[in-house]
Amino acid sequence: MKTLLLALVVVAFMCLGSADEVGLGNEQIDRGRRQAIGPPFTRCSKCNRNWSPPFPLGLYTVSHVKSCGGHLSSIGQCGEDWVVKGCAKTCPTAGPGERVKCCYSPRCNKN
């Protein structure tokens, strides 16, 4: 019982934390497609929509933005360092230097 409770606490902490805190910076990146590759990072490019309301499974994209002269600027000026795509019940909180886009459409995570 204690093990199950500990596992639930760890999962809750990971889901509620910043996208950077969840360890999204450790995966391999396909620079051509600007997307995380390899298990388990590609399994959420399309979310399972079989969740009953009020808990839909949404898609999110996390962009780490390069800084220009110590200041974060728009994506167009400095470009995205890399992009992570995944699924979550709630939108993750953007950490320092991150931009998070969340949506609930099956097509929104293809950008």
Curated annotation (Swiss-Prot):
The entry's keywords: Acetylcholine receptor inhibiting toxin, Disulfide bond, Ion channel impairing toxin, Neurotoxin, Postsynaptic neurotoxin, Pyrrolidone carboxylic acid, Secreted, Signal, Toxin
Chain residues in the propeptide: 20-34
Disulfide pairings: C44-C68, C47-C87, C91-C102, C103-C108
Signal peptide interval: 1-19
Lineage: Eukaryota, Metazoa, Chordata, Craniata, Vertebrata
Modified residues (Pyrrolidone carboxylic acid): Q35
A GO term for molecular function: ion channel regulator activity
Family affiliation: Belongs to the three-finger toxin family. Ancestral subfamily. Boigatoxin sub-subfamily.
Protein name: Toxin 3FTx-Tri3
Purpose of the protein: Potent postsynaptic neurotoxin. Displays readily reversible competitive antagonism at the nicotinic acetylcholine receptor (nAChR).
GO cellular component: extracellular region
Organism expressing this protein natively: Trimorphodon biscutatus (Western lyre snake)
Keyword Secreted: yes
Tissue: Expressed by the venom gland.
SUPFAM superfamilies on file: Snake toxin-like (SSF57302)
Subcellular localization: Secreted
Claim: Secreted is one of the keywords in the record: yes
